[in-house]
Amino acid sequence: MSIPKGKYTTTEGMNMKINDAMRTYRLPNPTTPEDLECRWSKLLTFGDKVVVAGYYYQHNKPCYYGATYEFLTDDHSCEGAIGLRAVSEVEFEDDGHAIAWAIAQ
């Protein structure tokens, strides 16, 4: 289950379109927490959400982003299916701010 093409996730202006985020940051959708942990080092399971902080190279400036996934089934183990729900459009100065944004979604 994924968000229809062209739809925003929560608050417009703070979030990228899901398809744009998948392409820009190479985020998989759907996936599993186990797969994300092998690709990204900053991942937290937070209740029904999985939050990720990632780094994207941009010349001469830091570009950290936050992403929020939600469990798609009742299996909340590392092998449960998760779907991408929100990705920050703003670029953060560090991964801590990116995680804080993702938790707030």
Where are these regions (language model features)?
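Negatively charged, low-complexity tracts enriched in Asp/Glu with abundant Ser/Thr
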Residues: S2-D48
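Intrinsic structural disorder/low-complexity segments
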Residues: T11-E12, E79, A100
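Acidic, low-complexity, intrinsically disordered interaction modules
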Residues: E34-R39, L43-H97
